[in-house]
Amino acid sequence: MTSRRDFLKKSGLAMAGLSLLNRSPLHSAIGAAAQTAGDLMSKRPPLDKRKFVSEAVDEEIRRVQGDIGNRDLAWIFGNCYPNTLDTTVQFAMIDGRPDTFVITGDIDAMWLRDSSAQVWPYLPLVTQDPKLKELIAGVINRQTKCILLDPYANAFNYGPTGSPFDKDLTTMKPGIHERKWEVDSLCYPIRLAHRYWKETGDTSPFDGKWRDAMKLVVKTFRQQQRKDGRGPYKFQRVTAVQTDTVAGGGYGNPIKPVGMIVSIFRPSDDSTIFPFLVPSNLFAVHVLKLLAEMSRDIMKDEKFAGDCSSLADEVYEAVQRFAVVNHETFGDMYAYEVDGYGDHSFMDDANAPSLLSLPYLDCVPESDQVYQNTRQFLFSGSNPYYFKGAAGDGIGSAHTGLGKIWPIAIMMRAFTSRNDNEISRCLSTLVESSAGTGFMHESFDENDPKKFTRSWFAWANTLFGELIIRLQKEKPYLLS
């Protein structure tokens, strides 16, 4: 059976570090030989080859680059920030409504998580660019269709074109690319919809179909609290990769129904060990509150708003009771996964939602002591997925194996830090990790950034752009 890892390898794009390096004019990280931004050839597609052109985004690139004193950093920012628009979006008007399909980059399919995160950094510009606003409205409309097709699926095709995972032992409908149940897949579209509404005041995407999709989200969350049995979802795959299939006959390892929501897979698309995935549950708490607000103000549905709020409260209380665990060194901290019986895992995974990313996603305050204790743990030898080598240090993922650091986790470290030295180290490592390609990657070897995975990973690229824009606003002196 084809796994996602095999799918990437067969596409010839998973490990393209050396070939890209040889084509790149950049062979250094921060502090190396001086080169002007003009010396470094843009890695963007030619104007007529770009999937979408936004004057507001291009102007933002010029504005921010003008404040970046480090030339390498300015060059990478100029390549990365527009990468989603340049290379991954397919816009159309369907039945008189905008529709935007967003691929991840090297995989020709749309993940609910990735697509939401990929366009998120452009939201501050939508009032300046009506076409950009329409594009993101199209993402919301497409996500609505996806959720209504199957709320348990994580990734979708543009149409009923078939999938390399058609033989998975689960209910694969036409149009589904992969059917891995991940709580965050239903959280990200709510986060995107709420921010779009707040930025624009536009409620046109939030029609009857969107409302049906949101009610299906809450229904699915309640099903996966498993108070009345295991629910309708199960998944197995014939594979040599343990994390691509599911224990317990496809239902996951046993849980005690304590109020949290089961997530059979992590945001990395790897199966969970203990099915209550803590960062995803806290993300669900946050977005359920956002959905309650939208229900009251847009849908005028107090009953559904109350349902969202009560579910958020129930999940939050369960997290505080069953997922805050005392560590002998770091004190009370969040476990990564729990089962309600007292079993837990102390670790983190690079993909967001992660424990590290909780303040970035507005799930917990940065000052929260339990979070701060957790954060200290994450960057210690006690975290089995914290790696440190000649090329830098950071959090990795079981998805890519030991010794592989993820740039997304380095960005989350910078987003959640107020320490200038820590942020500067993150920027240095990110530039180093680019390995002369001008782009971010999925992961890189702790000792050799030229050994990286996924040369075209749009979420990481656009997130890097978001980080630089935030620093330009809040700490511009770090970009010199």
What kind of region is each of these model predictions?
Residues M1-L8:
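Twin-arginine (Tat) signal peptide motif
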Residues Q35-R113:
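Low-complexity, Ser/Thr/Pro/Gly-enriched N-terminal "stalk/linker" regions
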Residues A56-G69, A117-P130, Y188-T203, L282-K300, ...:
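Well-ordered alpha-helical scaffold segments within catalytic/enzyme domains
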Residues D108-I136, I140-T243, A458-Q472:
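Aromatic-rich carbohydrate-recognition surfaces in CAZymes
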Residues K167-P174, R179-E182, S345-P365, G403-S480:
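C-terminal capping/lid segments that line or modulate ligand- or cofactor-binding pockets
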